[in-house]
Amino acid sequence: MKNKYDFKLVEEKRNEKWQKKGFFIAPKQTKKPFSIISPPPNVTGQLHLGHSWNAFIQDSLVRYHKLQGFDVLLLPSVDHAGIATQVKVEEDLAKKGIKKSDLKREEFIKKCYHWKEKQYLKIKEQWDKLGICYDFSKERFTLDQDAQIAVSDFFIKLWEKNLIYRGQKAINWDIKLQTAISNIEVINKPVEQKMYYLKYFLENSNEFLTVATTRIETISSDVALAINPKDKRYLHLVGKKVVHPLTKKLIKIIADSNVGSDFGSGIMKVSAHSILDFEIMEKHNLESKDCIDNYGNLNHEVPEFQGQNRFFARDLIAKKLEKEGFLAKIETVISNVGFSQRSDEIVEILKKPQWFVKMDELAKSLISHLNSKDKIKFYPKNFEKNLRKWFEKIHDWTISRQLWWGHRIPVWYKNDEFKVQIDSPGQGWIQDEDVLDTWFSSGISVFAFLGWPQNFDLIKSYFPTSLLVTGWDILFFWVARMYFSSLFIMKQKPFEKVLLHGLIRDEIGRKMSKSLGNGLDPMEIIEKYGSDTLRQALIFNSSPGKDIKFNIEKLNTAWNLNNKIWNIAKYIADLDTFFAKPDLIDLWMENKIYILKRQIVKNIKKYNFSVIGTEINNFIYGDFSSRYIELIKTRKNGFYARKLLRKVLIILHPFLPFLTDFLMEKIFKMEILEQKMPRIRQFKENQKVENILEIIDNLRTYREKFQISKKIILEYCIINDKFSNAEIDIINKLTFGKWLENKELVIKTKNFEIAIKVPEELKKEQKGRELKEIQFLKSEILRAEKILTNKGFLEKAPREKIDLERTKLEKLKEKLAFYEKK
């Protein structure tokens, strides 16, 4: 073995070997299963640090359970990522001078599949470098042929239960991507904008009502003013009419409990382009008319400003209203504005025909399950509460998207007829142009990837899956949808447990992003430090639900641990290996391994990886390296040390797969993934070794304190305690000491009194130091006496200062008397 840990030597082609030997091909279940469906990364680009973190956690858990004797399955997949991938492909085509509109739908989809294949190869290469134990014989793609059948079947089953409908409703519209998006794809951000206070004159009156709005551009779609029925200020006005400031038409004043009395003047204009406003219109049978088109421009409803961008038109409309006396004032405010998570453009609310999933019944089913004993266990627990709250206030889910790349909606039209089915009903039938929301297909992946609805072999063995590992940021996007979809289709929960981790941030707590320039490429880290080092740096800093503040120091710490393990293994491998029974030290070490294993088993159940990391670091640096290796240096035989090393490698394997596999192969000529988690004896007589270590530590501390050369034999004995000759021999060898009965200098430790015969060299040095101290004390006494006999000092100095000098003099004389007596 090389003198220094070389991760490139260790990790080269190791995952290739694991795959060739089929270590992670899930068998037909014969033992207890442990299964994870891996969150599918998007085929939009390469894996980032967050993907690596998630994959490492899953992989470590699967390896751990394999060593524990489980039948394991870690199923790999990638997501077609509808909107995101279509944008990437369009951008790629644009570089070649090709527009999406230049291609037929089928041609564009072929381009998307080509993109997917290219990106998937890159992702697989990255998985290989990470060392993830996927069963590639079962790999899936959210848009593969089986997935298309499953998604269409799911749609049809929801339709048959009257849980899917097509309706003209207010939806979130992405101006840039030209598609509908769901509510949870809208991110609210605080934005500085103008608040316009508009005058609405009462019919046939000079009195007016003041209405505050940030969306003056929607004024032409106003159909009413609304007040809260509990607001006594305006209750007498309900049923009356006001003059529309722009169109001069009369509109009604209505009462609705959704109006907030504390916002602005407490009067709300009811117009298109707000979900709340649309709900009020429906409740009061008011006609709605959009004044903004698909591209965010004002339409024919505002002839004077038709074609103007809605935000640019704000100032134009304000100037017109001010000129005509309908604008009271303008203020600058900070208020939340909805942005598309997909494009980062401001979302517009438009009323459009879309496909929706009715969520009431599905939400009730999920909440009911959360109230049962069979509910999914969330780590940390507080995310169960978050999920429950979200479902208690959930809206219907907009599932149609105006895209080409994705699952086509299985609905066919012919004249005024339509049919919901997978295949075309025949000639003249045209399929719906829209595709389904990406999360619609991802939401059934947990059972669809296992074969539903065509093959149930894997479902019988591995469903519900044991665990889902994912970031808390997609709890509502993905976890929630798999939950209710599984309850609806499979009539049971999708997984036993959900482990939610946080986000990876930089060392000052900022989210990593391209715009900030603080992102780190996991492949670049692996190229410099190795995969095991990156795994450690991420996993050993993981706690359920918590973010990681990542920095280079974490990588250095992880690399140092790998190097220490390498050095320990090399030392033991170089020892003689003739048969020998374990001695006291070996049994003590085995007990330390027993404690380590117990701590790992305890904490892995709670996914407390940071605690596991601390335990492993303390064990390697403390018990194994500083203690055991030091203790066995008193002998040349490493027979039992090798046995212990083998056990340690197996225990550490889930967290350091490459290094432990290499060392097992190199030293023991064995495959670590063919081993089982070792049984380890608990040793009750540890105190004897702890006593030896206590004596060694104190003798070493004494030697270091007085800088006594190792060439000088340290003579000592332990007062009123018996140590065997073998134990004394160990102490002597590791402290360069010699047992000698004496009572010259007694050191009290936690459990013992150690008598040390002070070396002559030290005595001489000590005597010289004491003579110098005596001379110093005498000179200080003379100085103090001179001051205290000075009349000027005694007359002018404050009483406190005189007393302080007298106290100093007394202490100096006491100290001098001590040294002279000595």
From Swiss-Prot:
Q: Which UniProt keywords apply?
A: Aminoacyl-tRNA synthetase, ATP-binding, Coiled coil, Cytoplasm, Ligase, Nucleotide-binding, Protein biosynthesis
> Subcellular location, in the record's words?
Cytoplasm
Any Pfam family matching the protein: tRNA-synt_1
> Mind telling me which InterPro entries this protein's record contains?
aa-tRNA-synth_I_CS, aa-tRNA-synth_Ia, Anticodon_Ia_Val, M/V/L/I-tRNA-synth_anticd-bd, Rossmann-like_a/b/a_fold, tRNA-bd_arm, tRNAsynth_Ia_anticodon-bd, Val-tRNA_synth_C_sf
Q: Locate the motif 'KMSKS' region.
A: 511-515
Enzyme Commission numbers on file: 6.1.1.9
Protein's GO biological process: valyl-tRNA aminoacylation
Task: Look up keyword Metal-binding and say if it applies.
Answer: no
Its domain of life? Bacteria
Catalytic reactions of this protein: tRNA(Val) + L-valine + ATP = L-valyl-tRNA(Val) + AMP + diphosphate
Q: Does the keyword Cytoplasm apply?
A: yes
Q: What does this protein do?
A: Catalyzes the attachment of valine to tRNA(Val). As ValRS can inadvertently accommodate and process structurally similar amino acids such as threonine, to avoid such errors, it has a 'posttransfer' editing activity that hydrolyzes mischarged Thr-tRNA(Val) in a tRNA-dependent manner.
* Oligomeric form and interacting partners: Monomer.
Query: Domain text from the record?
Result: ValRS has two distinct active sites: one for aminoacylation and one for editing. The misactivated threonine is translocated from the active site to the editing site.
Please report the name of this protein according to its UniProt entry.
Valine--tRNA ligase
